[in-house]
Amino acid sequence: MKNFNGKLILIGLMGAGKTTLGRQMAQRLDYRFYDSDHEIAAAAGVPIPTIFEMEGEQGFRSRETAILKKLIVLPHIVLSTGGGAVLKEENRALIRKSGTVVYLHAPPETLLERTRCDNSRPLLQVADPLAKLRELYAARDPVYRQTADFTVESANCRETVQTLLKRLSR
């Protein structure tokens, strides 16, 4: 693994725990925490589902790249990326060269349990959210693994934080 340079970038599907774990890691490291989805919505002045409605996924992805470019240059950060941030090669290259990238992995069934009551996820507003999560998982899991410096199972938050802290100190 490359040396930890003070930038921790979390990738993974929606519901993997990137935001929850990211906040915990930032607190433990005494770093600033950023959630790219939150930053996109704040910059746009509207929630993400509205961006998807008005601009489609492509418009959202363009905004995502712009926000990643702004955040990635900041020192001592923990950055939680959106689940689809790695879909663009430009984003993958940017995050790979900028920090330590961790794939928070969880199976689709766990992801569904964690996102079941969250109506702010446009990609899950379908008749069969589990089938959609399985489809996203099949398509994205290999990309996450390729992009990440290492993969961590995101089961118990406290244990995952400890695992990450150990990995970063190597």
UniProtKB/Swiss-Prot annotation:
UniProt keyword annotations, A-Z: Amino-acid biosynthesis, Aromatic amino acid biosynthesis, ATP-binding, Cytoplasm, Kinase, Magnesium, Metal-binding, Nucleotide-binding, Transferase
Gene Ontology molecular function: ATP binding; magnesium ion binding; shikimate kinase activity
Known pathway: Metabolic intermediate biosynthesis; chorismate biosynthesis; chorismate from D-erythrose 4-phosphate and phosphoenolpyruvate: step 5/7
UniProt keyword annotation of Kinase present: yes
GO biological process terms held by the UniProt record: amino acid biosynthetic process; aromatic amino acid family biosynthetic process; chorismate biosynthetic process
Binding site for substrate: 37, 61, 83, 140
Domain of life: Bacteria
InterPro entries: P-loop_NTPase (IPR027417), Shikimate/glucono_kinase (IPR031322), Shikimate_kinase/TSH1 (IPR000623), Shikimate_kinase_CS (IPR023000)
Xref: SUPFAM superfamilies: P-loop containing nucleoside triphosphate hydrolases
Top EC class, one word: transferase
Catalysis: reaction(s): shikimate + ATP = 3-phosphoshikimate + ADP + H(+)
Cofactor: Mg(2+)
Xref: PANTHER family: SHIKIMATE KINASE, SHIKIMATE KINASE 1, CHLOROPLASTIC
The protein's assembly and partners: Monomer.
Function (record text): Catalyzes the specific phosphorylation of the 3-hydroxyl group of shikimic acid using ATP as a cosubstrate.
HAMAP family: Shikimate_kinase
Name of the protein in its database record: Shikimate kinase
Organism classification: Bacteria, Pseudomonadati, Pseudomonadota, Betaproteobacteria, Neisseriales
